[in-house]
């Protein structure tokens, strides 16, 4: 620890020389990272040159990138967003970028720094202002005087769970809502809204067909959100929902009708069963449930945003497995969606975890696979293996 203090004191002196020279504004973000930020975290025990421990510039196609991901025994422990010297760390968009990416990845902590200042946030708190999510902040002048706090970001600290303990003691982990729980809850809410709306406006339809139609529509909406965030499709859903929704009285076509027309276009593009014609496309839906569902799939403005390009496949797979394992039933209040273990067993609704897919691809498919068509997840994993 004393050796770390000496290295950090040297960085502080170097920073003050730059500050006094009046050249602080000349430093770009990359120069700041090279001269100050990476040496700071090296002093805290992280091996910056080891890609298994610190990964540089992890991208998120729907919203820029974060600069570093820090790993401990293969597990992500925090993301770091770096800014150039003298950046205004009070800008909320700086912190939100790191928090948003960390939350979607299921990582507890997000760090924002320009070396002069450093802020640590709990990215899993989705309610309240940024101040409620901030665990601590520290100025470079206090790096030595308040070294125990800075040391919370050291590799040794994460090995011993010190930041977790600090966050617990300061009530900064009490409202934690993991991405898998929140997404699962929102997907189930979307399904409930759809089934109730379809049931209300299409009373002659069979309940099993209603269930199938709701599932089909929700499948398409989730697919489009993933495609949007991965840069494959433009943000069609939000644009369509807000444009038509805001001018509902003037438009002859509502969001639901516009979507069904869009599905015909997408069927020609993707040529898959996902967008093939289904009876629900001719059903009625007039209580704006589709608009509400689209908004849910983007997140809650000011609190959390879904970035489907960042959400791990294990999270999506687990949520999807749980979602498919529900059955639509009649109840005294009308319609209910309940969990059905029998349905899961009969239809084989079980998600294959990523580590199993990795093993199969690397040990069975990789040596012989040429141009065979396999599922999207297997194809993605195989591509990763070839690039490695």
Give the positions of each predicted feature.
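Extracellular structured ligand-interaction cores
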Residues: 65, 115, 219-221
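A short, conserved, highly charged catalytic patch centered on acidic carboxylates
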Residues: 1-109, 117, 122-152, 158-166, ...
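Short flexible/disordered coil segments
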Residues: 115-119, 375-378
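Preference for the N-terminal adenyl/adenosyl cofactor-binding alpha/beta module
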Residues: 1-21, 84, 154-388
